[in-house]
Amino acid sequence: MQQILLNNSEPILVEEIVRTVPQQRIVVRGIWGGQAVFAKVFYGARAKQHYLRDLSGVNYLAAASILTPPLLGQDESSVDGALAYVLIFAAIADAVNTEQLLATSSQQARFDLAAKLVKVVASHHQAGLLQTDLYPKNFLATTEHIYTIDGDGIRHYAKLDQKTALHNLSLLLSKFDVLDLEYWIEDLLTVYAQARDWKTFPHRTTVPRLVNTYRQKTASMYADKKVFRQCTDVNIQQYRHCFVAWASDFSSLPIPSETEQLDALVAKASLLKGGNTCTVALAKFGGADVVIKRYNIKNVTHRLSRMFRQTRASVSWANAYRLQFFGINTPKPIALIEQRDFCLRGKAYFLSEYVEAPDVASYFAQIEASATRDETVKEIVQLFYRLYLLKLSHGDMKFSNIKMLDARPMLIDLDSMQQHHCQYFALKAHAKDLRRFMRNWKDDTSLYNAFLQAFKVVYVDHSPLIKAKILSD
């Protein structure tokens, strides 16, 4: 068993490396002095600064009587021959990360947990504390309690003003599922006001706007920037004539980065879709089925028009991660490969996992029970409403671009998907998506009417249905 040797006490027996932030810190689960613990090891150029900031945050939480895992010890160690600082915390028995709970619990259980998190954040604010890294993963839940972890993000204010507190609350709310929050937000604002001993919640209309701003900003930072550079989720390789972004989860697959080799594979693979603009093929790598979507350059004029613009492959890459970020089903992205001469782009490839699943029309043709059909209709309509609330438009909602996997819809063909920032254009694009989707069922009156009824029930805001002319004023 691996050990972390400490300068002033017995070593930590490491059972699991929980998290690694290169050149900054390592978080491990293990045993220290016969007790189950979590330890943070700070190393690198700013090790002491990060260590002291985390320690300060933990002390602020403890002083305010806010539940946080007890700090059992502080010590020093060595990483790569350099001094490292160690904080050792008691492991909380049966505690689960609240991000995991929100992803796996029933709707009522999710609301109950969200309300508890809002109360905890209200207690932070009441004590003049602000968690700047406000993610559900920075809280642990047991049957009875919520624990705040990660002291590094805790800041103390002599007097925390209302505006700052509401921005921080909005940051937390932006991390909840957009469809859940659409139904919960009024109740959660009431929970917060009661926890702060406020008679009413001030600026009630401001918070939803802030939530949307934070949500879009966080998603864009991840999908439009982070996954195009070296990070935990993605490995980057840059060659003289090629740019490669590789999903860390698929780093073991023997996929070539040379475009000539990829073209040879596409030529031998099973063709799923041919055409001048793009070619889609199914290939096998190390036993895994992989979809290769190659965006072709048709001629010199087409090359000149594309070389300064973002490739459609990179749009698919970003949107796949965007949907994953929002918890929307889509095949996992594997790699993005672009021909590049300096900053000039050429042919590009988007690789994703192959998912064996019927499209939505085939799925409905297989369904016999009306209850199953109605539940499937509701799932698809909820997907559409979620996209509307997120200001995301797909651009081509034909039935073949919606697969059904384990009775849940999955979106494919993401190169026309757009993240809108203006409500006017978001509404216009969503109405277009709705019209295209409903045209799929123009010859099936029963299914068309089932979707229409579900849209009327699920959509709290009927304006996109009216705009799409599938519902009258």
Q: Where are these predicted regions, by residue range?
A:
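Conserved ATP-binding subdomain of kinase catalytic cores across diverse folds
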Residues: 3-96, 116-127, 131, 252-359, ...
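Juxta-kinase regulatory segment immediately upstream of eukaryotic protein kinase catalytic domains
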Residues: 1-16, 206-268
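AlphaC helix of the protein kinase catalytic domain
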Residues: 97-106, 360-369
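Short, glycine/acidic-enriched loop or turn micro-motifs at the edges of active sites
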Residues: 136, 153, 356, 399, ...
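C-lobe/activation-segment region of protein kinase-like
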Residues: 147-217, 410-473
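Conserved protein kinase catalytic/activation segment
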Residues: 138-149, 401-412
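Conserved alphaE helix
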Residues: 109-120, 372-383
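Catalytic-loop of the protein kinase fold
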Residues: 129-136, 392-399
